[in-house]
Amino acid sequence: MPIFKENMDIHKRLLYHAFVFPFLFLFIFWLVFLVERVLYTDFTVFGIFPLATKGLLGIITMPFIHADSTHLLANSVTFLVLSVLLFSNYRHIALKVFILIWLFSGVILWVIGRPSWHIGASGVIYGMAFFLFCSGLLRKKIPLVATSLVVVFLYGGMVWYMFPLGIDNHISWEGHLS
């Protein structure tokens, strides 16, 4: 029995760590949103404005800025699910992968985006979905392939928002693509 209890403690600790980072980021998402609302200000200027120096800071700050509560809630749920899957299945490389996705999605958006402000965590979300799907298939380990299938089942429809066809002009399809 002690070995079983010890294994349970290890699994609880690993699961706890898989949730800490995602919840910390979600807390920051919501805190920024609440500060923006309480101060009656607009943080859109902390987004990315492609090919302009004024938009470079957005590579770091864009995922924290959301247009409204609907945008924030949609990103929050998806971000939580995908980041927990990332940090639970790839705990040794998850932080590195997360940071690379964060930075590269911002840089790519800065290069390819329309000349307007782009905000939200969609680039990071799409990047995590892409990583979880591809990595699971390429590594050919059953739990990771299962994760790939979960991602496709839950978020396979996201692919249609990577193209400008039929999307509202205020939605950054470039942010999804990057």
Across the structure, where does each feature detected by a protein language model lie?
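A detector for small-residue-rich transmembrane helices and their helix-helix packing motifs
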Residues: 2-178
